[in-house]
Amino acid sequence: MNSVIVEDDPTLIHRFLFHAENKPDALAYCFLEDGEIDRQRVSFRDLREMSTVVARIFSSVCQTQEPVLLALPNDCRFIVGFLATQLESLIAIPVYPPEGKHKRARFTSIVHSSGARVLLTSSEYIKRCSNYFSTLADDGVTVIDIDSLLNGLLLPLPQGVSDVNGTLVPGEVSTKATGLQGAESSVESYNVESYIEPSAKPDDISFVQYTSGSTGEPKGVVITHANLIENQRMIQRSFCHDESTVFGSWLPFYHDMGLVGNILQPLYLGIPCYFMAPIAFIQKPFRWLALISKYRVTTSGGPDFGYALCAKRVKDAQIASLDLTSWEVAFNGSEPVKLATITRFHAKFSSCGFSAKSMYPVYGMAEATLFISGGSRHNEPQALQIDSAELQRGRIIGAAENENSKSLVCCGDDIDRQQVCIVDPASRLPVADGSVGEIWVTGAHVAKSYFRNPELSRSTLAATFDSASDSNADQSQCKYLRTGDLGAVVSGDLYITGRLKDLIVMRGLNHHPHDIEATLQQLDASLGEYACACFTDNIGDVDFLTVVQEIAPTYAKSGSLEDLADKMCEELNQEHGLTLDSIYFVRPFTIPKTTSGKLQRSAMRSRLAENAVTPIWRYLSPRIAPLVTQNGTLEERVSYVR
């Protein structure tokens, strides 16, 4: 392997400048229009020139280590804006643009919690969110239009964006918001050859990753330059990347996997990445595979659902045009990795060169910058067939494949026991090999704080073992990230079993909600197209199981929801020994998710408690219906009692 790593780079921005100096004309990023047309290619020199222009403007309105909001499209402008913050040693805060009620509420929450007074956005978002941005400006936030700064440098412009004098830049908002009326002329006369030398130090904050978690309230994970560059080294080593690596991606830039894994890892290595918009992939999953085939991509991946979507929607006739022999690392993470998905994907695409050894299950999270561990890089994914009943008791016991077993995919091969530990969350002590506990992580890549939230930082990012009972004194002094994930280590390999907060405990047995949800969604092919959330609820001292299932409007009109509810109750009783007391059939996109697509079960539970959901149809068991009527909190929701 040809190494491209310089171990003494103090920060990633220094590494980027090294590439800009030594191979200025090399391709850094290519952006595809509609996931198919090669529209824009950007070299390292281009990136340096454009980011320097924006950084100069930042220097006139920002102090060192001041937070800057980045609400930009998934294209070159996002990367330029991010690099500009790094050049000026500012704190980048990527945030989804405030389009739509939910995103606007999240955006407002991040503005307030971060205390940011500067926002970098684009001309199209200034137009579409003009009233909202004007309100921010009235509150003292400086809103900067990146398109006006890069006029003449960013060519060709993304489709639908005009130049600074075009119709997509509302002058009254732009002028009022930015307070930089003289910025245009200063940029035109600015000599981009007078580059900026970054002052960032390893312990300075590089950016803040806002993650919603299970409750829906954004929390900002502080990523220092030291965290970032250590995680880049970990990714490079584990993925076996070198100077011949070529990336391809459809992941959103605001997601940690998209930013850290697909923008910054190529930048760190000095290699190219080919991007397509997330919507282009969702519309036609074939586009992703065609990109890999056309540009001879070696590393590309995403959540499990992306592979499932390809296996389901790519037509056999399309496969004949693909050549996936270049695809060495097909990373699969961000949500539970399913053996069934891996098997179906390989079966469908092996004929066009996809190797089973390329599939690479990974585990990570924003609090660890991104990457924590991965499976065996040069072997087929490893899976355990385990006894489902023993898993309910917190033990991983091998079993033959049958109706009483389930599969777990390895997401960490030969892990470092000092960095990844399985801990009993009650006693705060490590558990034995093969026992399920909470996954705790430590290392230079792990964040030390949440932005402006010291209490949460102490409880989640600085956990320690119970030193009074721990025989390993050195390890008991370490501070760990409590991931909130449940898992086990078997023969040195890591297996993820679920989320601690989502765990359903009934009659002393542990049930993982995604297992229950998977059982229910197999009852009808149409159910798998939409989200399903399972959790425990309570009225007074009575705990009960609730399922919320999104359904298509056409299904709701068929009049068969009562039969479906009966099937759900019977199936859960037969497969899991559980009584289902409450079912809500709701419209698509009702169940809230995180920005990375994970179900927010706690948030869904809260929405039901607040009567914030109008179900299409609902069922309550005879055990719960009288309590609902007496309690009064859910009385209006009852429409069917069996």
Curated annotation (Swiss-Prot):
SUPFAM superfamilies named among the record's database cross-references: Acetyl-CoA synthetase-like
GO biological process: Actinobacterium-type cell wall biogenesis; fatty acid biosynthetic process
Keyword Ribonucleoprotein: no
Family matches, as PROSITE patterns: AMP_BINDING (PS00455)
GO MF term set: adenylyltransferase activity; ATP binding; ligase activity
Assigned EC number: 6.2.1.47
Gene3D superfamilies cross-referenced by the UniProt entry: 3.30.300.30, N-terminal domain of ligase-like
Xref: InterPro entries: AMP-bd_C, AMP-bd_C_sf, AMP-binding_CS, AMP-dep_synth/lig_dom, ANL_N_sf, FAAL/FAAC
CDD domains: FAAL
GO CC field: plasma membrane
PANTHER family for this protein: DISCO-INTERACTING PROTEIN 2 (PTHR22754:SF32), DISCO-INTERACTING PROTEIN 2 DIP2 -RELATED (PTHR22754)
Family designation: Belongs to the ATP-dependent AMP-binding enzyme family.
Function per UniProt: Ligase likely involved in the biosynthesis of a polyyne metabolite. Catalyzes the activation of decanoic acid, followed by the loading of the activated decanoic acid onto the acyl carrier protein TtuC. Decanoic acid is the preferred substrate, but it can also use 10-undecenoic acid and lauric acid. Nonanoic acid and 7-octenoic acid are only weakly activated.
Entry protein name: Medium-chain-fatty-acid--[acyl-carrier-protein] ligase TtuA
Organism: Teredinibacter turnerae (strain ATCC 39867 / T7901)
